[in-house]
């Protein structure tokens, strides 16, 4: 069946139900169902990612938390902070800075280190970019991997094997290897080869030397060659370990962003109630972050675009006058039109003050789409737009500050 959704809602998601032997098992089942669920369509917007991130927020803390109806808006505000932060970070700049630092630190063979990092670039950056493009997925990943990183003396480091974290990330994003899927929907073959080799290497390391966790692996390499291993073989093992770990520090960019925004400040108290940071309860701040989480369509300074699809009404009722007409001056917060979605009538307010030059939608009950031009206007104040070069410079500067937390 082909149909159009006029908002971020779909009953196919709302009616999902899972069961388990425990509350946590039921949550884990729900996380897996949401992970495997795919809805396809033209201009499709649903709340699937929101639910996926929210379920992992509880799994990463405790499924026994007792949130009230007050919880969702502060939670969405925290996710909005992640969205804002993601827009201020350039992953490619972070990667170049990390690679430069690692090559400079290499004593024996800089060329090999440079080649190793180049071979792993897409393996490491592709999932990070996908997470940063979806703040709800990023929220879920940060919740799931809170214990995978530790912050000591102003610096991040791994508390779990980064290779395992990376493998789990591909699964989290449903990018597992498959011979039947298009390349866009799975890990690429050359990246899969590197990741599989790394997983096999650490599995063999565990079998041979009894390394059950990341701490044991670190202790193994710090203590020197085991008696059962020749110096030549041990040198080869060390080289393989260094190669597989090279560049994985880029994963620490994500918890660095979480630390910068205070993502983990929204927490569960010992009595299972929710602890709210004051900033997440501020109404004006909540509205600002909601725009970061669901940004309105990009418009020129002399136009107003439809924030969502639906049915357009230019007046309160059939007998009422139009909200605005050509030549009408409006203030920020004045109603401009009403959009109806699934029998819900939402009044859309002016984001700034200005004068209507032209109304581009004729009549009431007209179906509009998100991003459609509705009004030509002359704003009271000219909006200063930053150039691409200025935006790029600001992102690079902020990214460099974050990179200092893990290099």
Give the ranges of each region predicted by the language model:
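Acidic, low-complexity mobile loops and tails
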Residues: 272-335, 347, 353, 404-405
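Structured core elements
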Residues: 8, 15-17, 303-305, 338, ...
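A residue-level detector for short acidic-glycine micro-motifs
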Residues: 314, 340-343, 358-360
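Short, conserved beta-turn/loop elements at beta-strand boundaries and strand-helix junctions
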Residues: 317, 361-364
